[in-house]
Amino acid sequence: MQAAWYSQNGSARDVLHVGEQATPTPAAGEVRVKLHTSGVNPSDVKSRTARPVSDAFIIPHSDGAGVIDAVGEGVPASRIGERVWIWNGQWQRPWGTACEYIALPQQQAVALPAQVDDDAAACLGIPALTALQAVHLAGDVKGQTVLVTGASSAVGHYIAQLLTQQGAQVIGTVGSEAKAAHARSAGCQHVIFYKTESVADRIRAITQGRGVDVIIDMDFSGTSPLLGTGALKSHGTVVCYGSNNPGEVPVPFRALLYGSITLKFFLVYDLSPQDRAWCLDKLSSLLQANALQHTIAAKFKLKDIVQAHEAVEQGRLIGNVVIDLTP
């Protein structure tokens, strides 16, 4: 099969290769999916750059969509021909979705409603599931004010939609006018231009000094200083799913303690079985109801995977980047 892979960390141009790899055979409990699309997420390019390579090679990307064409022992043959989307394709294993075929445990290939196309389906495993878990951890947000950092990102756009559906007032941070328009299209009633405005001052103005009830955060290294400014109410909650600084991050401990602030962190690859089941069930319902907007910023063929990774790294596109694996 045709696949893209890397054997060492480095820039996309230096380490990504495209060529032939062995076509996998599904083991017991597995399905093989003929992939139509592969989603490229920021975590994929970060892994290529910095996560130690302990296998002979890594076929990148965890998200994708396609059709089951073979099943292993113990999997009903009736699943052959089923359209599916994939989660955790390359989590703790070297075989991701940047290839023509993937074999993986059958529960990681989820039935896809007919009305959801393959491009949108390549955006579900990380962006949509991260958004669902973040909003789930935020609790009952009806009538509350929620700050979403990175509201125009793939994850942030889904988060803003979900919060709006649940009756929250959503404030989003963005980096440009185009990204502000995208955030508003997801339901953000207010946007803050974090590059040119004081986020804390704008929050206090919007909330008349009360602060927000919840912060759903993509970059704890950037948001941690905000927690000592009164931007978050006492007894407020922070739900965080990432940090641009993966090392130690200082926190305003006194403000957190005396504000009785709740911090909730999670890694979408490592949800508890109960949370994973809840998110998958909720996402299936939303997809059936056509209740989510999906934004595809750019599509590339597998031979152009270097440009796809570079596009994600540059951060200028609005929406998801997808690899088209069809002939």
Regions from the PLM with identified roles:
Residues 85, 213-216:
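N-terminal Rossmann-like NAD(P) cofactor-binding module of classical short-chain dehydrogenase/reductase
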Residues 83, 145, 169, 236-237, ...:
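Short glycine-centered segments of the SAM/dcSAM-binding site in methyltransferase folds
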